[in-house]
């Protein structure tokens, strides 16, 4: 006949010698104790830890001991669930033998796996952030590719804004007491207005948005130059060349 009490006392003595710094007796009847299990150090010396509480059943080891997660550090809920499932499996497989050392060893290995998973997850997150930063920098450097369509669209917008600036400038001059120009005078001074576009832009401050990236690549935009045409005649037919 099995002497369960003797087997339990012998195992308790062995456990106390194996885990001198992490073994704590909670009660003697029924025998109940805790063992703190810590993983190996991971990145930045980070560890995960759990304290297991065991209570011998009357017919242990022919019956599984009672067990629970007494406390834990740095473990997710799913990690705790996995550890409890592992303990149940190991207890079932080792019925009839003293098993606390086997259960604790299995949990120790599981904690080491969790630390490795944390390290892998953080490395993947770091790589993902670096990839996103690289793509953002590349997009910022290259900008929007220039096409004839978006250049002409920008040019139309630029010309419209420039015209508004000219009108505003003329209105301000009129309000300042200057004589309003006639149609002929406006025509004659149009050249001066064109050559003073830069001054208008400076006065406008940030009112005109210029996308510099549109000027980076203009290979696809062909501008006609009459002087490159071999049949080009600067003197139109029928004009008086003596003028």
Curated annotation (Swiss-Prot):
SMART domains: RWD. GO terms for cellular component: cytoplasm. Protects DRG2 from proteolytic degradation. PANTHER family: RWD DOMAIN-CONTAINING PROTEIN (PTHR12292). GO terms for biological process: androgen receptor signaling pathway; cellular response to oxidative stress; cellular response to testosterone stimulus; cytoplasmic translation. It holds the Pfam family RWD. Interacts with DRG2. Interacts with androgen receptor. InterPro entries: GIR2-like (IPR040213), RWD_dom (IPR006575), UBQ-conjugating_enzyme/RWD (IPR016135), ZC3H15/TMA46_C (IPR032378). Residues 10-114 form the RWD domain. The modification N-acetylthreonine is found at residue 2. The gene is Rwdd1. SUPFAM superfamilies: UBC-like (SSF54495). It comes from Rattus norvegicus (Rat). PROSITE patterns: RWD (PS50908). Residues 208-243 are annotated as: Disordered. Residues 209-231 have a biased composition (Acidic residues). Belongs to the RWDD1/GIR2 family. Residues 142-197 are annotated as: Interaction with DRG2. Keywords: Acetylation, Phosphoprotein. This is RWD domain-containing protein 1.
